[in-house]
């Protein structure tokens, strides 16, 4: 069972730096720190799970939840001591994506910088591939 934790925004990026990793998803230091902070007082959870749902004006949106277990079909990303699990349905949509955590005066949110996105809605919450 999982519990929803945060909103997520997507951004289409034209190019992505080539990183020496085989993971479908990489995390920025800001994202790693936020994930550690979120899990600090929650020993019952082993990490975060990224999923994708049909929703919004552009078709798809990412979900981000706490998770207590790894499903057999989940892909695990282990980076800098944090574990992020990717649901099977989201794996192809996340290839080459960078997960960041951005704080401004008005909001704080995880941002998925995804080179595979063909279009996003005006608010950035939904996308199509």
Curated annotation (Swiss-Prot):
Location(s), subcellular: Mitochondrion
Chief localization: mitochondrion
Keyword check for Transit peptide: yes
Coiled coil: none
Molecular functions per Gene Ontology: 2 iron, 2 sulfur cluster binding; metal ion binding
Keywords on record: Iron, Iron-sulfur, Metal-binding, Mitochondrion, Transit peptide
Recorded GO CC terms: cytoplasm; mitochondrion
Superkingdom of the source species: Eukaryota
Gene Ontology terms: biological process: heme biosynthetic process; iron-sulfur cluster assembly
InterPro entries (alphabetical): Fe-S_cluster_asmbl/transfer, FeS_biogenesis, FeS_cluster_insertion, FeS_cluster_insertion_CS, HesB-like_dom_sf
Annotated positions binding Fe cation: 57, 121, 123
Presequence range in chain numbering: 1-12
Keyword Mitochondrion in record: yes
Signal peptide, first to last residue: none
Family named by the database record: Belongs to the HesB/IscA family.
Role of this protein: Involved in the maturation of mitochondrial 4Fe-4S proteins functioning late in the iron-sulfur cluster assembly pathway. Probably involved in the binding of an intermediate of Fe/S cluster assembly.
Record's protein name: Iron-sulfur cluster assembly 1 homolog, mitochondrial
Organism: Danio rerio (Zebrafish)
Chain's gene name: isca1
């Amino acid at each position: 069972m999982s519990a929803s934790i945060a909103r997520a925004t997507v951004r289409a990026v034209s190019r992505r730096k080539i990183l020496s990793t085989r993971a479908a998803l990489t995390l920025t230091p800001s994202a790693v720190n936020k994930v550690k902070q979120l899990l600090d007082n929650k020993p019952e959870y082993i990490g975060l799970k990224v999923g994708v749902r049909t929703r919004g004006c552009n078709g798809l949106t990412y979900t981000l939840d706490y998770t207590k277990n790894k499903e057999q079909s989940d892909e695990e990303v282990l980076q800098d001591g944090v574990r992020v699990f990717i649901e099977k349905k989201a794996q192809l949509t996340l290839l080459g994506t960078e997960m960041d955590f951005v704080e401004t005066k008005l909001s704080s949110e995880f941002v998925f910088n995804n080179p595979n996105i063909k279009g996003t809605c005006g608010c950035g919450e939904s996308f199509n591939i």
